[in-house]
């Protein structure tokens, strides 16, 4: 069972930020406006909150849930790099996938198997629920699809990076 002191400060920050980064990158996979972005971010936060509630018996989740400090965000230039908007969004998604892989590898090394499985599942669920939170490609709420092909592709990439089958 893993507690906060099982991790370095940077490792703990990574574990805490990874779900938010996944939600943001899911939104970036197929951007569709401010209201959709807000819905997708809120859906990701809801998944994290639910994971904390349903995994209270796991020390890692109990520690994550009780840490109310505000972690430092990565430098945007590190996540986005240079280039066109499309290039920056692609770099952002790739940077997030690298962090997902690092976070899940870290939990696999330092936490119990149950904690690692629950953490992996949480990250995959964040991507799925964020993508499902608003329609893509419609007009004023009419038409469109719930999860776009681009979002579905990113969900698959998150699952692969997290080791979720």
Annotated model-derived regions:
Residues 1-165:
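Small-residue-enriched hydrophobic alpha-helices in membranes
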